[in-house]
């Protein structure tokens, strides 16, 4: 099956940003969404050593894997809600009905050990993109079936994991109250927010889950989120290379087993 690249002419039914069409997806109904394009091939090959490249355009790189006889798409989204919204819109139009977001994260709760697996049940909507689909009163919640598959996988694999609420921000620095920035200043609305989320039992920060959950719910689709903590925000801002490598391996293991437990592409 031929792949596509940024220079290829747009053919019929190829979506503008992801450069994919239904034929390329070969009936896939499940998509795994890492943020980093560099993780796509690794994730796909963990599911299937024969996985192959499909397309790459801007932040959207995609590979197709086969797991237990069913097709699974792995497609990067880049960072943040706006690019996630583009990816979900275009993949949904191509027949994807279930979305698993995977990524790394910063732990808020000080008792979370690295690289703990964190499975999100709902997100604090600190993003802007989700408000273009539903008002702030609308909850950002994960699909129960997909979430349960992740929890069951983590338990079966014996991996330390936590299940709960995530703070989903539009920005990596001020929105997550980081002071190691160009100016060193955090706007007043975010000053003290890390401590507040800690007291409200929010587990972690990331940047995509709220947008993904809201869009999936509005569209009648399914979405879940699993991340691996690579920093503890109450102790450090810089991830260790060994922790990062273990985090990526843990995510791949959990994701593969969750798909197997769920039946891979059953919607």
What is each of the regions a protein language model found here?
Residues 49-56, 158-165, 264-267:
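Flexible, glycine/charged-enriched surface loops at secondary-structure junctions
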Residues 37, 106, 167-173, 211, ...:
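Glycine-rich beta-alpha junction loops
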Residues 149-157, 215, 254-262:
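Generic non-transmembrane alpha-helical segments
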Residues 191-224, 230, 235:
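A C-terminal functional module that forms or caps the active site or interfaces directly
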Residues 2-149, 153-156:
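Metabolite-binding pocket within alpha/beta catalytic cores that recognizes anionic/polar moieties
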Residues 233-267:
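His/Asp/Glu-rich mid-to-C-terminal helical/loop segments that flank catalytic regions of hydrolases
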